[in-house]
């Protein structure tokens, strides 16, 4: 039996972002500028809003021995968990820039999606914003990015 999977999302203009989302975007852009990306020249920044109001950022860190580097999303999520292990994530925002400036928007890689899903399972689902220069993709439940993800129930 064939089935169809749909992912609900919204598109927002920059003017439709809340003041908090604009702050997260600015922090993610600042993080992206700190990325170490000498090979791809693709700089990604992530900003994580914690339930305690803290904002944690991360950037991608490349390595000549690919895939030994890490993505911005995992950098931010792991740092948040290491510093505040019992504080839930309330929101994740991702941006990217390259040599030409802002890119339209990017979606997390498979490894990042798995970490995002594990984080949501650990606490609660949270929204994810994929911010481009002109448009932001808003997904209310981050787990929708990995509908058939692996979890601890299989262990």
Language-model features, listed with the residues they occupy:
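Context-gated lysine
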Residues: 33-34, 91
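Short Pro/Gly-enriched beta-strand edge/turn motifs at strand-loop
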Residues: 26-33
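Short, compositionally biased leader-like segments
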Residues: 1-26
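Zn2+-dependent cytidine deaminase-like catalytic core
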Residues: 57-155
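Short loop/turn motifs at secondary-structure junctions and domain boundaries
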Residues: 37-40
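Short beta-strand scaffold segments in enzyme catalytic cores
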Residues: 43-50
């Amino acid at each position: 039996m064939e089935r169809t999977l749909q992912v609900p999302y919204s598109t927002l203009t920059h003017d439709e972002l809340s003041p908090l989302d604009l702050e997260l975007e600015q922090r993610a852009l600042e993080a992206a500028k700190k990325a170490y990306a000498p090979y791809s020249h693709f700089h990604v920044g992530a900003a994580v809003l914690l339930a305690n109001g803290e904002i944690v950022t991360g950037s991608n860190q490349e390595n000549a021995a690919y895939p030994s580097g890490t993505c911005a999303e995992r950098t931010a999520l792991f740092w948040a968990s290491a510093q505040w292990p019992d504080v839930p994530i309330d929101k994740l925002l991702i941006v990217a820039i390259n040599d030409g400036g802002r890119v339209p928007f990017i979606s997390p890689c498979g490894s990042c999606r798995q970490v995002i899903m594990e984080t949501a399972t650990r606490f609660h689902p949270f929204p994810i914003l994929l911010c481009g220069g002109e448009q932001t993709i808003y997904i209310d439940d981050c787990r929708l990015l990995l509908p058939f993800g692996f979890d601890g129930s299989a262990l």
